[in-house]
């Protein structure tokens, strides 16, 4: 079959460095679907590190339940579909057979050995088949996929309650880059890359022309980011403080009788959001984070500034990392809004020595160790950093880093399948905690608690947990936040923590729409005039 595989070529041009990725995205991508901006900043000094932007996508691959959809967005992307179809095993049914290819995978027997389950045919194989459609694809970013794995993807692999949803978020959604723009903020360099999958000279000429077009756009004056003004914002939540506190108390009962040790129930806040990019721009300026993202899909927009890595893998070293965060405190501020350094340091010390926070954190470090033990070579797993503190605009977190060496018989998708969803967004034991979450929340989480980032055909993967984020559909932003509950949890403090976690995103939306809101949430609806 190898003679049928596609050969790819990478066309690359260096261009002018621009320090403002949001302005570039607005200037080049505007409101086009299937575009993505991924950014990173130093935790300590908040300086930008790297920005990657999918300007044009060749193909969109998504999954919902056991059905995978491949949508060719260009002729270049379309050229991959015949080879992809030839790689499908007979167990996979083709439901529609055109540029909008739909395929159905068989359901997985969920009550089998964990290691056997990793090797059973699954929707993750659709990504593997797509990667394997191209034979010379191992350049560092030559075959670059950006997008998300939803929290609810786990339901295809574990026996969890079936839930309703009002959102259009699939179980996973990734764009295969056709035009990728990469900014290195430390070196102040920029290059644009085109990935050519078609053997057609016409397609090659199109991509060469598109490279020059994007390069020329970078030398033009940028369109200013439009300002949006709303006279009032109605802030809603799906659960009042009292209702959320009741759920927390019920979860504590499950902990007391020994069903679970820790669990992360969540609540949702809703705000109007008619200018998502402006809100993202404010969020990243106010709250620079290791992972910042703006995903513009045909059905939704997702943006955020996440402090927490989900899974990170380096192909050369085979090193795989989990970065558990558990333990949160608000930053201390003076009346003028600046950080009160003395009080801030005392709050940090209290968090570092708090029995409840330490027990919750160490429980999740242990869970991360157990997750990696399933997929790593024996003797390679260790805790690289333990109970450090990372500080952001509104909160500080207790963090650790757990590292191992991935087994040779596994790839990053096996690793993700084995580790989802991260314990810091589910609990321990993980499956029972997720069952209790489903029973309490009664609807799908969608993007919240899943992950967003990128992977390449060479095997590199870097994803963050989707928190401190807004999922926007029909001009309504959903901001979902949770609190880690253990035996020592004080319900009112956990309610307060959920609101502290929401503040940065809610403030960014209100500021970008010139409308003031407050966070005194006791009823389901409040009007905040600005």
UniProtKB/Swiss-Prot annotation:
Residues that coordinate or bind Mg(2+): 360, 497
Binding site residues for chorismate: 327-328, 448, 468, 482-484
Annotated L-tryptophan binding sites: 40, 290-292
Domain of life: Bacteria
Recorded catalytic activity of this chain's protein: chorismate + L-glutamine = anthranilate + pyruvate + L-glutamate + H(+)
GO MF annotation list: anthranilate synthase activity; metal ion binding
Regulation of activity: Feedback inhibited by tryptophan.
Family listed: Belongs to the anthranilate synthase component I family.
Record's subunit section: Heterotetramer consisting of two non-identical subunits: a beta subunit (TrpG) and a large alpha subunit (TrpE).
Name this polypeptide is given: Anthranilate synthase component 1
Native species: Buchnera aphidicola subsp. Schlechtendalia chinensis
């Amino acid at each position: 079959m190898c003679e049928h595989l596609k050969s790819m070529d990478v066309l690359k041009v260096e261009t002018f460095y621009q320090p403002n990725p949001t302005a570039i995205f607005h200037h080049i991508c505007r409101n086009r679907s299937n575009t993505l901006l991924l950014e990173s900043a130093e935790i300590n000094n908040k300086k930008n590190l790297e920005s990657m932007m999918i300007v044009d996508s060749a193909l969109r691959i998504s999954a919902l339940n056991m059905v995978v959809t491949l949508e060719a967005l260009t002729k270049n992307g379309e050229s991959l579909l015949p080879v992809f179809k030839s790689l499908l095993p007979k167990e996979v049914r083709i439901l529609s057979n055109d540029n909008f290819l739909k395929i159905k995978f068989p359901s997985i027997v969920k009550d089998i050995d964990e290691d056997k389950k990793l090797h059973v045919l699954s929707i993750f194989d659709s990504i593997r088949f797509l990667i394997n459609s191209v034979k010379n694809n191992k350049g560092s970013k030559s075959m670059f996929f950006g997008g998300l794995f939803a929290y609810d993807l786990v339901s295809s692999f574990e026996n969890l309650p079936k839930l309703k949803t009002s959102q259009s978020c699939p179980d996973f959604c990734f764009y295969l880059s056709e035009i990728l723009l990469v900014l290195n903020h430390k070196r102040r360099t920029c290059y644009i890359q085109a990935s050519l999958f078609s053997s057609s000279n016409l397609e090659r000429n199109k991509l060469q022309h598109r490279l020059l077009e994007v390069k020329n756009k970078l030398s033009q004056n940028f369109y200013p980011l439009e300002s949006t003004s709303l006279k009032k914002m109605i802030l809603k939540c799906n659960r009042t403080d009292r209702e959320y506190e009741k759920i927390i108390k019920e979860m504590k009962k499950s902990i007391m009788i020994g069903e679970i040790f820790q669990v992360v129930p969540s609540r949702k806040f809703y705000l109007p959001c008619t200018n998502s990019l402006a809100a993202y721009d404010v969020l990243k300026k106010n709250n620079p984070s290791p992972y910042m993202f703006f995903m513009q899909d045909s059905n939704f927009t997702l943006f955020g500034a996440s402090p927490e890595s989900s899974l990170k893998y380096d192909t050369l070293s085979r090193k795989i990392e989990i970065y558990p965060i558990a333990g949160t405190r608000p930053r201390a501020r003076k009346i003028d809004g600046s950080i009160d350094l003395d009080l801030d340091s005392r709050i940090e010390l209290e968090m570092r020595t708090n029995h409840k926070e330490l027990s919750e954190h160490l429980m999740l470090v242990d869970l991360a160790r157990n997750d990696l033990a399933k997929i790593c070579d024996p003797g390679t797993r260790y805790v690289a950093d333990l109970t450090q503190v990372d500080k952001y605009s509104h909160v500080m977190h207790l963090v650790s880093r757990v590292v191992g060496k991935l087994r040779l018989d596994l790839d990053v998708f096996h690793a993700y399948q084995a580790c989802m969803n991260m314990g810091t967004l589910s609990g321990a034991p993980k499956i029972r905690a997720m069952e209790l979450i489903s029973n309490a929340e009664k609807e799908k989480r969608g993007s919240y608690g899943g992950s967003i980032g990128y992977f390449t055909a060479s095997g590199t993967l870097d994803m963050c947990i989707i928190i401190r984020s807004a999922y926007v559909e029909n001009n309504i932003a959903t901001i979902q936040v949770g609190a880690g509950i253990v035996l020592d949890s004080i319900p009112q403090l956990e309610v307060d923590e959920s609101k502290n976690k929401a503040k940065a995103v809610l403030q960014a939306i209100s500021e970008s729409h010139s409308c003031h809101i407050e966070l005194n949430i006791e009823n389901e609806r409040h009007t905040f005039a600005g």
